[in-house]
Amino acid sequence: MLTKFIASVALVLAAIPAAQAQLPDQQTVTDAYVYLLGRAIAIRQEQTDLKEPGIAYNVIKYNPAGSADFVNPNLDVAYLEAWIAVDGKTPVLLEVPEVKGRYYTAQILDEWGEVITNINERNYPSHPFGKFAFVAPGSTAKVPADAVRIELHSRKAKLLGRVELKTDPAGAMALQKQFKLTPLGKPDIKPAAPMASFGNKELIGVELFDNVEAVLASALDVSPIAAQMQAKVRDIGRQARDPGQRQALDKLIKEEVVPKFLNYAVTRSGVFQNNWLATLGTGNYGADYWKRTSANLVGLWANANDEVIYFVATRDADGQPLNGANDYVLEFSAANRPDAVVNAYWSVILVDVPDYRVVKNPLNRFNFNSDSGLKSEADGSLKILFAPRPNAAVPESNWLPSAPGKGFSLTLRTYVPKDLVKRGEWFPPAIKRLK
């Protein structure tokens, strides 16, 4: 009798529609989603980059110096970028010119957004320029005797080079063009991993978990909890393939998971003080995949804090959104000036919101930096004005124009910040509205 009862129960359970099967708990889905989204954002960028005319693996793209055409641009450097692709037998050689008297770095990142290294005189004091050979993990391929051997985390990496413009943009551009990338053979290059298209305004849903095995196999994650997280991802991937659960899983992701992640990315992924958000802890994330994915979403390819820390402000000292209807002043005391807390340089840029583009103005003045020749006050303090028109309270040379009546955001960059900045002990002062 008992055997017959168990058999009948089994038949009834088998007949229950798959849609009634229980979904994984919301936290498991959230963790798996946030973890894998970081990789998806990098895949999306790879797909986008390789669609551009003239862009190919192991080919450097030399971006225009100080171009204001990008979103929240860095107008202080000449940029160069490339996708590096190697295989077990084929290294890729990077040649770095000798750079004197200005900041430079060749930042190398893996496909999860982790910084592998920065090639410059600080990290390679005995070989600050010359040849650097990138090889696949575990590769025994020979490299030139005069090249520094650098093992990548997987078979692809992103190169982002920066050369400070200072007061000589032509000189920076000449140096930029001297960075060369050459494969030592013909590497077997796999295309970007499969990933459905998505935008930041409407993040990907359950489609994130399609092709899970191919995505995870495409790039090694060096996070100490990668195995644990990838087990969760595979579990959700199995659920996503179940037609009875797919719709419910997509609904959960879009209505609960995505809003929770976006709130974290905007309000909790950095350190807030004086209504400035500091990008502390970027570049190398350890087990903190929430911060890594947030950094990838907000500014993919974030660098390590030894190289740069960003401070971002969208509100004034009273917590009100910055707006071009008002005049604001950022006042550094003589002892708290940004030039005193960097070993390279600092800069501040104003961009409109929500487009994050520079504000066109007759002065073509979009940012200030260490070489802008700003006027100090008699006591050594420094005032910077953000307003739609000059204000007698601040020297006109220190005025960054805003768009009348339009919201804006400020980004203050500190390059090669000193230890107190990296420890979170220095922040820009709150931005005050002039009455």
Regions found by a protein language model. Give the residues of each.
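A compositional/structural signature for long, glycine/proline-rich flexible linkers
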Residues: A21-K435
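Gram-negative bacterial Sec-dependent N-terminal signal peptides
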Residues: M1-A21
